């Protein structure tokens, strides 16, 4: 009976770790800056292709967004202190 209790305690821990590892790395308070891809041509229908183009442009991610399906690249914003 003790092993089933241990298993039941392990499930929430594994779930939490999965969520933690799957979430994007981002410092608290840090915003993401977005820009339209310069190299993408045409409508954006496959976000994986958009992401690869954005990475080749120096961004960390890319997604198809908007009604007109543009490839939008993103990366963490860096704000200089005053």
UniProtKB/Swiss-Prot annotation:
Disulfide bonds: 33-77, 44-64, 50-71, 54-73
Pyrrolidone carboxylic acid: residues carrying this PTM: 30
Subcellular location: Secreted
Cellular component annotations (GO), alphabetically ordered: extracellular region
Database matches in Pfam families: Gamma-thionin
Record PANTHER family: DEFENSIN-LIKE PROTEIN 1, DEFENSIN-LIKE PROTEIN 7-RELATED
Name by which UniProt lists this protein: Defensin-like protein 7
Originating organism: Arabidopsis thaliana
